[in-house]
Amino acid sequence: DGVSLIIPVALLNQVEDQGFDWLIPALRHELLVALIKALPKQYRRNFVPAPNYADALMQTISPQDGKLLDAVSNRLKRMSGVTIPEDAWELSSVPVHLKMNFKVVDDNGKVLQQSRSLSILKQGLQGEVQQSLSQVAEQGIEQEQLTQWSFGTLPREYVKLQAGYEIKAFPALIDDKHSVSIKLLDNPEQARALSLLGLRRLLLLNIPSPV
């Protein structure tokens, strides 16, 4: 039930968890009512009837205002003078169908995993994302058994258009102890950190032995 967003696994690393808390306009009023009704009584009693306050919120806030709960809290405070602490919002009490569902699919459209949490999906599908990025890489991008800097400039970002999607990956120089390799990763920070270690290994491999 509710709304599902279909995400190709190769694009999972590019989807930011921003804006999905607002859901779609058709369900937003119901979501706002549910949020207000889920407040602890000491706060909820200030916003009765909840549907009326939801009506007012629908007219005065939008996704351009940032995070949904921040926008709702700020607007309700302006309307009533009541400050709602962040931890007063009981998201667990909101019906499941009022939370965005994320479905990650493979190249054949088969659902690999689905969850209401994007971060859980990213953590659980790291291996599948990595494999998918390797499959779309052009020949020569990923290399192994390198002992010299024979691959030119290593770009910070690799972009490829596939099936109408712009797939982004981040080349990293990986330390393999006796050599280095170039791998495409889904995380730019991880790629930078590992590349520093890979660069160190490559330098050590090219220092002449004192013996």
Predicted regions and their residues:
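A positional "C-terminalness" feature that preferentially activates on distal terminal regions of long
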Residues: 1-211
